From Swiss-Prot:
Gene3D superfamilies to which the protein is assigned, alphabetical: Aldolase class I
Catalytic reaction equation(s): L-aspartate 4-semialdehyde + pyruvate = (2S,4S)-4-hydroxy-2,3,4,5-tetrahydrodipicolinate + H2O + H(+)
Record EC number: 4.3.3.7
An example Gene Ontology molecular-function term: 4-hydroxy-tetrahydrodipicolinate synthase activity
The protein's name in its UniProt record: 4-hydroxy-tetrahydrodipicolinate synthase
Gene responsible for this protein: dapA
Record note on quaternary structure: Homotetramer; dimer of dimers.
Compartment annotation: Cytoplasm
Swiss-Prot/TrEMBL keywords: Amino-acid biosynthesis, Cytoplasm, Diaminopimelate biosynthesis, Lyase, Lysine biosynthesis, Schiff base
Phylogenetic placement of the source organism: Bacteria, Pseudomonadati, Bacteroidota, Bacteroidia, Bacteroidales
Length: 296
């Protein structure tokens, strides 16, 4: 089953909004074209960076439809399908059309803080409910619970359609255990732009990126250099991103990346509550950092 190739850089696409709060579909079309023109390896739609919890069912369907129509099977499309209600996730998988989708990204259940056995059972039933390739997503800073290496490996070994994990725990030792003991064909992806070089250095095959929304060509080049063993030149590019990494998350994601895209003239600086744009002081820092990055 493990057929989808996730090597390289996938980009977790933002959702642009107009000043009136509606989805800015023309801006979204532009962003997807921008990613394609700059050589990304795959797209992630309706993830955390997309502000998916604030999108209506109709908006989610239209966003996926639009992205599929623009991409036209040139690169894989991964759609976020997760939640803390196992039956609701299964219902979604059983009732919606995923015919043009290459894989799903499914987050560890959040808020209700399941045990490791609960996490295992959650993904077991999801894996049994679909033939789609599944990318596990471990992000304890958001979910409130960490999926251990042991649970991740158990799922990877038990279900052929669980093909990868986006690891955003920040725990390099834990991620290393997964990489060392994973079954053949199972792919480990960095869920953190800043840690991507370190994780590729121990065997990760790429990254699901936020900064790639802004700099797909430059960040993608860094990832490819690292994967091809040119760590020296990859580190040079990584160093150029240092301040931008900080600004991405200083007031939360996607506030930082949306501020950057606004400075570049791609989108309105608009988020949906309870998320808000970065403060003016941070916005000014973003402007200066982008100017410095462009002149390097």
């Amino acid at each position: 089953m493990r057929q989808i190739v996730l090597r390289g850089m996938g980009v977790a696409l933002i959702t642009p909004f107009k000043c009136d709060g509606t989805v800015d579909y023309p801006a979204l079309s532009y962003l997807v074209d921008y990613q394609l023109q700059n050589g990304i390896d795959y797209l992630i739609v309706l993830g955390t960076t997309a502000e998916t919890p604030t999108l209506s069912y109709e908006e989610q369907k239209e966003i996926v439809r639009l992205v599929v129509s623009i991409v036209r099977e040139r690169i894989p499309i991964v759609v976020g399908v997760g939640g803390n209600n196992t039956q609701a996730v299964i219902h979604k998988l059983n009732t919606e059309d995923f015919g043009k989708i290459d894989a799903i990204l499914s987050v560890v259940p959040y808020y209700n803080k399941p045990t490791q056995d609960g996490i295992y059972q959650h993904f077991k039933y999801i894996a049994q409910a679909t033939s789609l390739p599944i990318i596990l997503y471990n992000v304890p800073s958001r979910t409130g619970v960490n999926m251990t290496a042991e649970t991740s490996l158990l799922l990877a070994n038990d279900f052929e359609n669980i093909v990868a994990i986006k690891e955003a725990s920040g725990n390099i030792d834990q991620i290393g255990v997964i990489i060392e003991n994973k079954p053949s064909g199972f792919q480990v992806l960095s869920g953190d732009d800043e840690l991507s070089l370190s994780l590729i250095g121990i065997g990760a095959v790429g990254v699901i990126s936020v900064i790639g929304n802004v700099f797909p060509k430059e960040f993608g080049k860094m990832i490819r250099l690292a994967l091809n063993g040119d760590s020296d030149n990859a580190r040079i590019i990584h160093g150029q991103f240092a301040e931008l990494f900080e600004l991405l998350f200083i007031e939360g994601n996607p506030a930082g990346v949306k501020g950057m895209l606004n400075v570049m003239g791609f989108i309105e600086n608009k988020l949906r509550l309870p998320l808000v744009p970065v403060l003016e002081a941070t916005y000014e820092r973003i402007k200066k950092a982008l100017l410095m990055f462009r002149t390097q």
